Amino acid sequence: MAGTAAPQAGSFLLTIFLRHDETKTVEQRNEHLRQTGWYDKFPPEGVEIVAGYVMMGIGQVVILRVPAEKLRDTNRVIEQTAWGGYRTEFYPTYDFKPVREAIPHHRP
């Protein structure tokens, strides 16, 4: 995984919550993901995983750098492969750290 969330022209960051389907065991979920091709198709070509985390009680959270023209491909891969194994939520995202560091801080 790349370690920087720096913006690139023509792309945006997309945070995806992949919430576990708790009606399935881990083995059932993994089998579903194998059958649908999740491991081979995600992320789609041209889309970069910037960060990924496992969050206990939630599932996985993945931050992608998505070229604008790849948004539909990203959506379709998730619809075709992740649904049934995960409930999904999407959040357009930006890296606030450089913004915060540019704000003058007044200290007593």
Language model: regions and residue ranges:
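Short S/T/G/P-rich N-terminal loop/turn motif that feeds into the first structured element of a domain
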Residues: 1-59, 66-72, 76, 94-108
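Short, intrinsically disordered, mixed-charge
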Residues: 76-83
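Conserved short beta-strand edge segments in small beta-sheet-based binding/regulatory domains
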Residues: 83-95
